[in-house]
Amino acid sequence: MNTYNARLYIFSLALALVILKGTKCYMYVFLQEPGAAFCVDDSGVRYKPGDVWYDDEKCEKLRCSGAEASLKIIGAGCGIIHVVGCETVRGSGHYPNCCPRPKC
Protein backbone atom coordinates (compact mmCIF):
# COMPACT_ATOMS: atom_id res chain seq x y z
CA MET A 1 0.00 0.00 0.00
CA ASN A 2 1.51 3.34 -0.98
CA THR A 3 1.43 6.48 1.19
CA TYR A 4 -1.41 8.08 -0.79
CA ASN A 5 -3.70 5.07 -0.33
CA ALA A 6 -2.76 4.73 3.33
CA ARG A 7 -3.65 8.36 4.04
CA LEU A 8 -6.87 8.14 2.03
CA TYR A 9 -7.84 4.92 3.83
CA ILE A 10 -7.29 6.49 7.26
CA PHE A 11 -9.18 9.65 6.25
CA SER A 12 -12.09 7.66 4.81
CA LEU A 13 -12.33 5.46 7.88
CA ALA A 14 -12.16 8.42 10.26
CA LEU A 15 -14.80 10.30 8.27
CA ALA A 16 -17.09 7.28 8.24
CA LEU A 17 -16.71 6.84 11.99
CA VAL A 18 -17.50 10.51 12.65
CA ILE A 19 -20.54 10.48 10.38
CA LEU A 20 -21.86 7.17 11.64
CA LYS A 21 -21.17 7.67 15.35
CA GLY A 22 -23.99 6.08 17.28
CA THR A 23 -25.13 3.85 14.44
CA LYS A 24 -24.98 0.08 14.31
CA CYS A 25 -22.48 -0.12 11.45
CA TYR A 26 -19.65 1.64 9.64
CA MET A 27 -18.64 1.88 5.99
CA TYR A 28 -15.44 2.95 4.28
CA VAL A 29 -14.04 3.38 0.78
CA PHE A 30 -10.49 2.32 -0.06
CA LEU A 31 -9.38 3.66 -3.46
CA GLN A 32 -7.16 1.42 -5.55
CA GLU A 33 -4.09 2.46 -7.53
CA PRO A 34 -5.00 4.61 -10.56
CA GLY A 35 -5.29 2.37 -13.62
CA ALA A 36 -5.62 -0.85 -11.59
CA ALA A 37 -7.50 -3.71 -13.29
CA PHE A 38 -8.21 -5.49 -9.97
CA CYS A 39 -8.93 -4.55 -6.38
CA VAL A 40 -6.23 -5.73 -3.98
CA ASP A 41 -7.06 -6.24 -0.29
CA ASP A 42 -4.73 -5.96 2.74
CA SER A 43 -3.67 -9.59 2.28
CA GLY A 44 -2.66 -9.02 -1.35
CA VAL A 45 -5.59 -11.03 -2.76
CA ARG A 46 -6.90 -9.71 -6.11
CA TYR A 47 -10.63 -9.28 -6.84
CA LYS A 48 -12.48 -8.43 -10.04
CA PRO A 49 -15.00 -5.56 -10.19
CA GLY A 50 -18.28 -6.83 -8.73
CA ASP A 51 -16.65 -9.45 -6.48
CA VAL A 52 -17.89 -9.62 -2.87
CA TRP A 53 -15.93 -11.22 -0.03
CA TYR A 54 -15.90 -11.31 3.76
CA ASP A 55 -13.29 -10.70 6.43
CA ASP A 56 -14.72 -12.80 9.25
CA GLU A 57 -11.97 -11.79 11.69
CA LYS A 58 -12.99 -8.11 11.41
CA CYS A 59 -16.63 -9.01 10.72
CA GLU A 60 -16.71 -7.00 7.48
CA LYS A 61 -18.29 -7.38 4.05
CA LEU A 62 -16.19 -5.99 1.19
CA ARG A 63 -16.94 -5.33 -2.47
CA CYS A 64 -14.73 -4.39 -5.42
CA SER A 65 -16.62 -1.58 -7.11
CA GLY A 66 -16.23 0.71 -10.10
CA ALA A 67 -14.87 0.38 -13.60
CA GLU A 68 -11.31 -0.60 -14.43
CA ALA A 69 -8.92 2.31 -13.91
CA SER A 70 -11.09 3.76 -11.10
CA LEU A 71 -11.66 0.86 -8.74
CA LYS A 72 -12.35 0.98 -5.02
CA ILE A 73 -13.04 -1.43 -2.19
CA ILE A 74 -16.20 -0.60 -0.26
CA GLY A 75 -16.26 -2.12 3.20
CA ALA A 76 -18.99 -2.41 5.82
CA GLY A 77 -18.63 -3.60 9.40
CA CYS A 78 -20.22 -3.61 12.83
CA GLY A 79 -20.64 -0.53 14.94
CA ILE A 80 -20.05 -0.24 18.67
CA ILE A 81 -22.91 -1.34 20.87
CA HIS A 82 -23.05 -0.72 24.60
CA VAL A 83 -26.08 -1.45 26.74
CA VAL A 84 -25.69 -0.68 30.43
CA GLY A 85 -26.03 -3.82 32.54
CA CYS A 86 -25.57 -6.20 29.58
CA GLU A 87 -22.60 -8.07 28.18
CA THR A 88 -21.68 -7.97 24.51
CA VAL A 89 -21.60 -11.31 22.67
CA ARG A 90 -20.17 -11.75 19.18
CA GLY A 91 -22.38 -13.51 16.66
CA SER A 92 -21.23 -16.20 14.21
CA GLY A 93 -20.96 -16.43 10.45
CA HIS A 94 -20.40 -13.66 7.91
CA TYR A 95 -21.26 -9.97 8.33
CA PRO A 96 -23.76 -8.90 9.63
CA ASN A 97 -24.45 -12.14 11.55
CA CYS A 98 -21.05 -11.93 13.28
CA CYS A 99 -21.76 -8.46 14.73
CA PRO A 100 -21.78 -8.22 18.53
CA ARG A 101 -25.14 -8.08 20.24
CA PRO A 102 -26.11 -7.25 23.81
CA LYS A 103 -26.94 -10.20 26.05
CA CYS A 104 -28.93 -9.08 29.08
Swiss-Prot record:
GO terms for cellular component: extracellular region. Residues 1-25 form the signal peptide. It comes from Urodacus yaschenkoi. The keyword Signal applies. SMART domains: SVWC. InterPro entries: SVWC_dom. Pfam families: SVWC (PF15430). Contains 4 disulfide bonds. Expressed by the venom gland. The keyword Metal-binding does not apply. Keywords: Disulfide bond, Secreted, Signal. It is found in: Secreted. This is Toxin-like protein 14.
